[in-house]
Amino acid sequence: MTNIRKTHPLMKIVNSSFIDLPAPSNISSWWNFGSLLGICLIAQILTGLFLAMHYTSDTMTAFSSVTHICRDVNYGWLIRYLHANGASMFFICLFLHVGRGLYYGSYMFLETWNIGVLLLFAVMATAFMGYVLPWGQMSFWGATVITNLLSAIPYIGTNLVEWIWGGFSVDKATLTRFFAFHFILPFIVAALAGVHLLFLHETGSNNPSGLNSDADKIPFHPYYTIKDILGALIMITALSSLVLFSPDMLGDPDNYIPANPLNTPPHIKPEWYFLFAYAILRSIPNKLGGVLALVLSILILMVIPLLHTAKQRSMTFRPMSQCMFWILVADLFTLTWIGGQPVEHPFVVIGQLASMIYFLMIILIMPITSMIENKLLKW
């Protein structure tokens, strides 16, 4: 009898994606993050669903409803903190996943890479809108500052901002629509992730050597299923430790103060995973310039395949490029640190330098380094 998993229309899809999928025999733990992101997304949708059962998207009751979830709902505190810190876990996995793609030249799969960048934008939008929902001080002022950036768009800016707000300031209409969008976006992300996977399976996975691995493939199950389970257990352990021991470590204390339009917090800053982009935004004194730099800091990922000048795909055998890559990583850490600092000397100058290095590194220095390596190898 033919195996049902190979004949049933639905099982066939699962089989070809997670069971009989031919995978390179040498992919390292850096290839675990795709499955970890899938787990994060499922966890976020489930915890979010249970939070939505108790949350009210009204300016008068939003803050109280979150307090009610934490105090009165059975394990509400656990669901809330799993959701909040799950977002941090999501972004840690995202950044590592993108970093892996940059290091090993996975961006040469154009469709997969571009949909990945689109996914990054969608997840960032989802996280931003989710941060507004508890309606604390940082929620309100974060929403005000970030939506206000759109007013930098010439001619239509002001109208666009008021259209997004649903009034003349961030208010009830804004909160209600942000809740609606925050609810729907993760499902769009899930659909996009399906397309991301579809395009990846057209080409097969890349591997650490960057060479063609058609001659040496192994089935995904049991080899990589068991490897993914180990990765998942490590991530779940890390998330559980964070949630159960220091759930507020990554949050802002200001968000425990109910939103007050008449009182601005001394330092408005986003969650840690947006700080690098926030630092780039602040490093340009012009409003429109800052907004453009902010968008380009992520959009630049789309041009990376065009800037690939090396004769080898991966950085595994390219020590100079490796050096440049790790300088870029250090620069991103610097930007993240600067984003959380007040706007004063010397942080402003450090931020401007780090922003300049970020763009120069990607557009100029790394492609030139690759060309030098080609020369050294007489290619």
Swiss-Prot record:
It comes from the Eukaryota. Keywords: Electron transport, Heme, Iron, Membrane, Metal-binding, Mitochondrion, Mitochondrion inner membrane, Respiratory chain, Transmembrane, Transmembrane helix, Transport, Ubiquinone. A ubiquinone binds at residue 201. Its main location: mitochondrion. Heme b b566 binds at residues 97, 196. Heme 1 (or BL or b562) is low-potential and absorbs at about 562 nm, and heme 2 (or BH or b566) is high-potential and absorbs at about 566 nm. The cytochrome bc1 complex contains 11 subunits: 3 respiratory subunits (MT-CYB, CYC1 and UQCRFS1), 2 core proteins (UQCRC1 and UQCRC2) and 6 low-molecular weight proteins (UQCRH/QCR6, UQCRB/QCR7, UQCRQ/QCR8, UQCR10/QCR9, UQCR11/QCR10 and a cleavage product of UQCRFS1). This cytochrome bc1 complex then forms a dimer. PANTHER family: CYTOCHROME B (PTHR19271:SF16). This is Cytochrome b. It comes from Suncus stoliczkanus (Anderson's shrew).
